[in-house]
């Protein structure tokens, strides 16, 4: 039997506010346990929550960016459940009247096609604390620094049909919230976490199968692996005569499998009711228009502009626009270096390899956009060749200065003096007289490879400094003469 996969995602994004959603406590990551928890965060009697306006503003920014309906009147509700890191015994969230309603986000698939993914809703809520197991023998520690950190939970429609589509959607959300500046997107620190709802059904069937939720997956790679593992588990289970049970599961990356965590709760299990300590939030049109006017250029518009303005392919434009920092870096390089396609190649390939090797983001790149742009100018005016440019790039990455100073100090300037190149070629051909005779006796089909030998010898003789175009032109004339 052929199976169709149905995937919906819930993405929890920590909003980049300076203070928590209902208290004035700081949200800095990595502080000593329980040093950023106020009486409000601890759920002490008699204290009242005060809504952080910046969290509301950031949620509205996201809603406008995905062309969603904004709830002009939205209500906070208490989600009741018991867990050690939830001091109040309930979480303040939104249920019936969320701040962001239906919207959509377009994702680019591997074959270049665009698929629209529906967003059901996005609602504001507070994060819970964190249970600590590592440093406690036979017990669990509780860190409430994270309790009350503002979250925007983004709930998709079940529109994805493969793990790769799911990853593309998460990457698109990740890029969008970083472009907007509402979340730093640091998945390793838990700033963006994903719950994956997965089900299967016979191909052609319209009714959904029983879904399982994979909780708190925190990397693109693990999202793909977790979903594929769960898909295979459900297929094997059904084909062996079993039934999928609705439940919450955890992904174990070491064993590459999901395992049962608990039975999946429904909304009525949480006994939602409006929080009596918080008034409904009323959002006026003027508030939204101010936010709309301040929205930055978003990834889809940037991709389109990169293609039309710079003549880039759809693939290159998507890669370069995948983060706001990378897009800005690229445009700064183009502004100085002039050639967009050359700049795109160096940013994606050479700089990308360097960043991967160092394990850093582009905003920590050891080669600045000004340095790279300056080096590209020297390629374009034939001061250095593309091959020599790699040596210059390595030196810039090592902190040895800008391109001009490195070229000067290392004597890397390309030889463009026709007389000097002509003399060097004569000496090289004289040293390879036998190969010259073989070349002249060979038919046209074999000459191409043999010509490459002479080019290599010429570049070796010039220590890579001879202008490749001039070498090719003069060499061909000498060999054919």
UniProtKB/Swiss-Prot annotation:
Highest taxon of the lineage: Bacteria
Q: Which reaction does it catalyse?
A: L-glutamyl-tRNA(Gln) + L-glutamine + ATP + H2O = L-glutaminyl-tRNA(Gln) + L-glutamate + ADP + phosphate + H(+); L-aspartyl-tRNA(Asn) + L-glutamine + ATP + H2O = L-asparaginyl-tRNA(Asn) + L-glutamate + ADP + phosphate + 2 H(+)
Would the keyword ATP-binding be found if you checked this record's keyword annotation?
yes
Pfam families (alphabetical): GatB_N (PF02934), GatB_Yqey (PF02637)
Q: Which PROSITE patterns match?
A: GATB (PS01234)
Select a single GO molecular function from the record's annotations and give it: ATP binding
Q: Which InterPro entries match?
A: Asn/Gln-tRNA_amidoTrfase_suB/E, Asn/Gln-tRNA_Trfase_suB/E_cat, Asn/Gln_amidotransferase, Asn/Gln_tRNA_amidoTrase-B-like, GatB, GatB_C_1, GatB_Yqey_C_2, Gln-tRNA_amidoTrfase_suB_CS
Q: What is its EC number?
A: 6.3.5.-
Keywords on this record?
ATP-binding, Ligase, Nucleotide-binding, Protein biosynthesis
- What biological process terms from GO does the record include? glutaminyl-tRNAGln biosynthesis via transamidation; translation
Report quaternary structure and partners. Heterotrimer of A, B and C subunits.
Family the entry assigns: Belongs to the GatB/GatE family. GatB subfamily.
* HAMAP family to which the protein is assigned, alphabetical: GatB (MF_00121)
Summary of the function given for this chain in its UniProt record: Allows the formation of correctly charged Asn-tRNA(Asn) or Gln-tRNA(Gln) through the transamidation of misacylated Asp-tRNA(Asn) or Glu-tRNA(Gln) in organisms which lack either or both of asparaginyl-tRNA or glutaminyl-tRNA synthetases. The reaction takes place in the presence of glutamine and ATP through an activated phospho-Asp-tRNA(Asn) or phospho-Glu-tRNA(Gln).
What name appears for this protein in its UniProt entry? Aspartyl/glutamyl-tRNA(Asn/Gln) amidotransferase subunit B
